Amino acid sequence: MATISDIDHPDDLSSLPAGPVEPLEPAGFRLTTPSRHLALQDPAGRLIARCSLWRARDARGAPTTAGLIGHYAALDADAGGELLAHALDRHRADGCERAIGPMDGSTWHRYRLLTERGTEPTFFLEPDNPDDWPRHFTDAGFAPLATYFSALNADLSRCDPRSDTRRVELERDGITLRTIDVGRFDAELAAIHEMSLAAFADNLLYSPIGLDAFLASYTPIRPHLVPELVLLAERGGRLLGFIFGIPDLMEPGRGEPLRTMIVKSMAVHPTCGGKGLGGLLMDDCQRAARKLGFERTIHALMHETNRSRSISARYGTTIRRYTLYERALP
């Protein structure tokens, strides 16, 4: 019979023996600070499923009535179902009215499951999971809360004909674009962090993130930064928009030529909405990628809304879909 353990401190993760499921790294616990971590072990003591729990936060950082389930991994449907039952019991006992997952504490960290794989191989920093994991959640009574997609533009010669006009209009308004200054990387990220808090405030399940945690989330990217692919839009030294492109390092890892850029994130300050700044950032980033020899762009992990679908239609075709789940806790 499987046994469940509650772990409240990252140092205790080292006590979990090796098994079919890899234990959570202590660094992941420290970065996302869950309220508890659940480990399911078989009769031989091997880890067969794990997850972490949080109370969701609102846009002001205050706790809500939703509980989050993240850091999810399970050997099979039986182990996953048993683990999720324990997780739901914990959230129910804590007074949560619904559960959402998978989400590693907030939308600033890993969340959602890959649910439509397509034929394109996994790209750099893309969340991946076994194809049966979505069924673990639906079998436990979860239903889709939101869907997301990644789109591929395989023709970087296509440019937005409105860009030149928009550039003139924005420059007339005092807004100019430049590449990131790698010599001031932390200071540049601090400005991106501050602007992101405003730009993403209306996003689904948004909650604020501290600067230190934000900087830490960019640690995997820093060694691979290509300054020409990170564009900042400013007026009078104030950041009003950005786009963050990175090379798809999975391609050389597979022995293939590096030919794809990934648009990791893009945002425009709410005061600049409707000016065409987002479109100009996107177009200039793709032009820069083509100039550097890239042949394709992946627009990664966009929330499936009418606006994002129009962006996909203009710049490429959908190659992957992802789902975030929820269920009520009666």
PLM regions with names:
Residues 10-43, 49-61, 179, 184-268:
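A conserved beta-strand-loop-helix scaffold within acyl/acetyltransferase catalytic domains
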Residues 2, 8-9:
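Extended alpha-solenoid helical-repeat scaffolds
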Residues 4, 127-203:
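Acyltransferase donor/substrate-recognition loop-hinge adjacent to the catalytic core
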Residues 35, 146-150, 319-325:
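Short hydrophobic/aromatic beta-strand or adjacent loop that forms the aromatic wall/cage
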Residues 329:
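Active-site-proximal cofactor/substrate-binding loop regions of enzyme domains
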Residues 33-34, 48, 59-64, 84-85, ...:
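Hydrophobic/basic alpha-helical segments enriched in Actinobacteria
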Residues 64-140, 256-315:
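Acyl-donor binding region in acyl/amide transferases
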